[in-house]
Amino acid sequence: MNNEETEVKPWIVRIILIVGGLFGAHRLYLKQVPEAFVFFSTLGVLLIGWLYDSFMFKYEVNEYNQLINQSENNKEKEKWKNGKMQASQSKFVDFSFTRFLYSVLYGSYIGLATWLACTVTFGWTDINLIPFICVVALGITAGIYIIGQCGGQSRELSYIWMASFSSMFIMVRLAQTTVFRAIFLTAIVSTVIGNRSARLKKRRHTWKHFLFWSSLFLMLVCVILLGCSRKVADKQVTATRPGTFRETISVGSLIRDRIFDAKKVHSFFEGNPIIEYHSKSDIKNKNGEKTLKNSSFWYQVWSGELFDELTGAAHLTKIDWIELTTTFIVDVLRSEARVIDGSSTIEPFKWALWRNYLIHRFSLDPLISDDRLRTECKKWQTEEKSKKGNVDRDYNILAAKQGCSTFLL
């Protein structure tokens, strides 16, 4: 071999683990590229994997050094009979429940991230659409394929893709399951089918594979962040004070001011004003439309006009869980202002959480006003008082009672 590999020092791996362990730098140094990407895309598997490797990294180093010291003939364990290799035995891989669990969870993770990007950024809410099913199935396939490459093994990409698409199609179009259940069950089926093609890996991945996978993942994250900025941060909040004036600000500006200048947020919600929500206007005049039509493709790309055109559907599409997230953020901020004013003594997070629960409990619009929600609570309380029966063990009723009493304080 022209490029002979040398043994690695444990202290070097420890330093790399401390500095860049959350992003999989130590795994990349040990040429465990798929494992490094999993660390990178999950921040060290939410710190748990990073903590585990901080204690067990010596075993990984010893295993790597043993592979380096092995002769060329012993790099792959092959079964021979009468001078011929038995291919079926050389490809045999033992079943591992741990790997199976990792594959299902990571495939579901990437699949959910793909679904989130399509929903938040591009406004795809109908999961029954074939293109939507294809994109989500592709995300699940990518996650299962990456896990299948870990530990010196590999999986056939075509097997995983066919199983993922067909399972997703059946779950969504025929079984009519929810998105989360469909993604999870599809990940299970795809992992089982993919394991049928499991074999020992015969080539090593390089940093180019890591760079390519990381670029795709970062692009996915950027798409999600851009969508969240349009659906959440760009949402306009109007505070109306009777007999005074109306003031409008975006949710993103409120979050920024809460971090850097909390007094602005408190002054905005001072006096418990009437809160209204509305989307940022995207209406353009005719001259703007003509400019968009006459401008070149690259000008539209660099100016952001093309992105606005592609994500226009998401900007107009109403998604309940995103609206609930927006109202929860605003509720926490205005509840903090009420505590500072002395008009409330309830913990802001608790008050906002109960308010969101009541919206979900009564199936109301996420952007409902406080007056309307108070009316619904009083109406529900009146109806419950007129009913006879033992409700001490009905947790739905008990939760609604607690939520209404907390909100009406």
Curated annotation (Swiss-Prot):
Disulfide bonds: none annotated. It comes from Caenorhabditis elegans. One of its GO terms (cellular component) is membrane. The chain crosses the membrane at residues 10-30, 37-57, 104-124, 127-147, 168-190, 209-229. PANTHER family: DNAJ HOMOLOG SUBFAMILY C MEMBER 22 (PTHR44733:SF1). It is a multi-pass membrane protein. Belongs to the TM2 family. This is TM2 domain-containing protein ZK858.5.
